[in-house]
Amino acid sequence: MGSGGVIHCRCAKCFCYPTKRRIKRRPRNLTILSLPEDVLFHILKWLSVGDILAVRAVHSHLKYLVDNHASVWASASFQELWPSPQNLKLFERAAEKGNFEAAVKLGIAYLYNEGLSVSDEACAEVNGLKASRFFSMAERLNTGSDPFIWLFIRPPWSVSGSCCKAVVHDSLRAECQLQRSHKASILHCLGRVLNLFEDEEKRKQAHNLFEESAHQGCLASSYLLWESDRKVDMSDPGRCLHSFRKLRDYAAKGCWEAQLALAKACAGGSQLGLEGKACSESVCQLFQASQAVNKQQIFSVQKGLSDTMRYILIDWLVEVATMKDFTSLCLHLTVECVDRYLRRRLVPRYKLQLLGIACMVICTRFISKEILTIREAVWLTDNTYKYEDLVRVMGEIISALEGKIRIPTVVDYKEVLLTLVPVAPRTQHLCSFLCELTLLHTSLSVYAPARLASAALLLARLMHGHTQPWTTQLWDLTGFSYSDLTPCVLSLHKKCFHDDAPKDYRQVSLTAVKQRFEDKCYEEISQEEVLSYAELCSALGVKQESPEPPSFPSSGEIHTFLSSPSGRRSKRKRENSLQEDRGSFVTTPTAELSNQEETLLGSLLDWSLDCCSGYEGDQESEGEKEGDVTAPSGLLDVTVVYLNPEEHCCQESSDEEVWPEDKSHPTPGTQAPPASAPWPLPCNRGDPGKDVTTSGYSSVSSSSPISSLDGGMVGSPRSTSVLSVGSHSSTKPCYHQAKKSCLQCRPPNPPESGAHQQPVKRQNLSVHSDEDTNLGFLKL
């Protein structure tokens, strides 16, 4: 009621509500900080350590998460990063928080004194104690694979002065005596090291260590004890049955070696009290559990890698394995390590050979008594890489593979089949030949290793005219029927025998596997006449289909990549190939020398081998230190050059060329008198800002043979193709952007009539460095 008794209604005319002010809501800004902490941890966990430090500097909350949560550091990636005085604190912090990669790299860095410079005084003792600490950390963090750190400290040990390997061994042993927990795997590693000595007393100590390790639950030690006691147990039926039960228990717990031994033991199932059906089921479970891993994924990760490049790399590794007489198992494991690494981490093409030879160094140490030493591995690459390069990539491989080196291979399943089924020796060799050919072709990886081994045996029996190539017994043992294996057999035959092998840039077919099985120990099985595709289809009872054309590129598309480390096996002819993309490759020069060049280079070849040796304890014997190293005559060549043939500075050369007679012919691995004439120096423009100092023990030389003659040189030039003797001195070398080279050569003396000289491999005197991409040539 208003004034004067007038009643006002609340209509729009009589009464007005105050207008509401509409406040515009600001949109909420969502940032990464708005995410829950659990989500932030998942984001931070898989970043590289450099990215983690960058994120840490963004906000105080992120700084708090990085500084106070161990999971961030435990999962940080240290890929392509090596311990140095500048980042040592980061590596140590990550290792203490549970980072496997950081612990492995620190252990290797201290063991080989690589990257973490320590004074020469008491170097081995100081580094050995530090290396043992981080190796112990790495082994405690290694939960998914067999103990592995023993492969780095296994003998041979240095006999002159203190040995870092021995210091690590003694330190780990002292740690096990003081520490009561988490030492089963360390004890196993110590036992593996002592078991490699010839001393009977040390072998007894190794047996005691295995017993203690097995008592604490180490499955690998339990199997080694079973293997050592097997001969004694087999003499008594009761003990034999008890031993078989233990083996079955180890196999059920996941020990791969025990599973293989159990399958092979089924050949004598009646002695073990097993029925034939039970034995077949046990073996069948092993074969059916085999899983295929498609290696074609490699090429989705490695954009610059082709199937032919991988083929050439594996072909070279086969030549090395043949030259060093390594087993097929060692070769298969090496290739598997290469492929697994290529699926996980990006590798530039010029490092493919380094990756391959490093995998072979690791695998020989893990499964063989005779090893490929680091210094010899460097020599096999013609010193294209330095000792330090190989040490570092070993750390990258172990980190990427998480310490898991031993995995099922085609060879394992083949050995089981040849144990269970009577097969003629020539058929066994043919089956082994086929299994080794499978390494070259990634397209065959769509089949599981067990299926490939079964198909190889079936194809071998078909080629040798067996009336029943696949019996009911084989069907029961493998679980694969005749029709199951037919597609795999056809693919195997097509890839191995129908398709042409790829050729290198010299138009030479890459046939290292074939040459490997031309040996008399394999009864020259690779020279046997092969069943034609039509005959195979008829034998299999399938309709013949026209095979697809070869998948390898034509010769014009193949880059210069690899050549043989064993020149005695094939005479490969050089030619002026026209190729591009030079900057992506590193070269291993292979050329013959004139007698003047031999006189100049003779002593330097052996001197450079000693200089790249690195760790003195990492050698096969004392004789190797004096130059007793197998010298390859032709190696990896990954340079791609695309030039006009008239302007190319490399003329044709071959093993058939005639050279002047030289009675004092130097051989790699033997000392030759130094040249009386002054040594011509290469033209090198190194980066003065680059830190090229490398650490190492007293036997490690951080400088190349050339840099020792010219103290003003810095940098590690990447080598290119070496000129053939006889190229014109006025010919200009080929240049690539961001790369400089200079070359002066003079024509050789005229050859004497009718005189032939053994070709000698030209030593690559320059060393490889990732940061420095300059090219250097010898001025002869």
Swiss-Prot record:
| Location of the motif D box 4 | 762-765
Q: Where is this region: Disordered?
A: 544-594, 651-733, 745-780
Highest taxon of the source?
Eukaryota
Principal localization reads nucleus
Short sequence motif Nuclear localization signal 1: positions: 20-28
PTM note says: Degraded when the spindle assembly checkpoint is activated during the G2-M transition. Degradation is not dependent on the proteasome or ubiquitin and depends on the C-terminal PEST sequence.
Residue window of motif D box 1: 310-313
Question: In what residue span(s) does the F-box domain sit?
Answer: 29-76
UniProt-annotated stretches for the region PEST = 582-761
Motif Nuclear localization signal 2 in this chain: where? Answer: 568-574
Q: Output compositional bias ranges, type Polar residues.
A: 585-594
- The Low complexity compositionally biased stretches are 695-708, 719-731
Q: Which PROSITE patterns match?
A: CYCLINS (PS00292), FBOX (PS50181)
Instruction: List GO molecular-function terms, semicolon-separated.
Output: anaphase-promoting complex binding; cyclin-dependent protein serine/threonine kinase regulator activity; protein kinase binding
Q: Where is this motif: D box 3?
A: 349-352
User: Which keywords annotate this record?
Assistant: Cell cycle, Cell division, Cyclin, Cytoplasm, Cytoskeleton, Mitosis, Nucleus, Phosphoprotein, Ubl conjugation, Ubl conjugation pathway
* Span of domain Cyclin N-terminal: 288-405
What CDD domains does its record include?
Answer: CYCLIN_CCNF_rpt1, F-box_FBXO1
- Motif D box 2, residue range(s) on this chain: 343-346
Q: Which GO terms describe its cellular component?
A: centriole; cyclin-dependent protein kinase holoenzyme complex; cytoplasm; microtubule organizing center; nucleus; perinuclear region of cytoplasm; SCF ubiquitin ligase complex
Instruction: Offer one example of a GO biological process linked to this entry.
Output: SCF-dependent proteasomal ubiquitin-dependent protein catabolic process
Compartment(s): Nucleus; Cytoplasm, Perinuclear region; Cytoplasm, Cytoskeleton, Microtubule organizing center, Centrosome, Centriole
Query: Domain remarks in the entry?
Result: The nuclear localization signals mediate the localization to the nucleus and are required for CCNB1 localization to the nucleus.
Function noted in UniProt: Substrate recognition component of a SCF (SKP1-CUL1-F-box protein) E3 ubiquitin-protein ligase complex which mediates the ubiquitination and subsequent proteasomal degradation of target proteins. The SCF(CCNF) E3 ubiquitin-protein ligase complex is an integral component of the ubiquitin proteasome system (UPS) and links proteasome degradation to the cell cycle. Mediates the substrate recognition and the proteasomal degradation of various target proteins involved in the regulation of cell cycle progression and in the maintenance of genome stability.
Subunit structure, interactors included: Component of the SCF(CCNF) complex consisting of CUL1, RBX1, SKP1 and CCNF. Interacts with SKP1. Interacts with CUL1. Interacts with CCNB1; interaction is required for nuclear localization of CCNB1. Interacts with CCP110; this interaction leads to CCP110 ubiquitination and degradation via the proteasome pathway. Interacts (via the Cyclin N-terminal domain) with MYBL2/BMYB. Interacts with FZR1/CDH1 (via N-terminus). Interacts with RRM2 (via Cy motif and when phosphorylated at 'Thr-33'); the interaction occurs exclusively in G2 and early M.
Q: Please state what the protein is called.
A: Cyclin-F
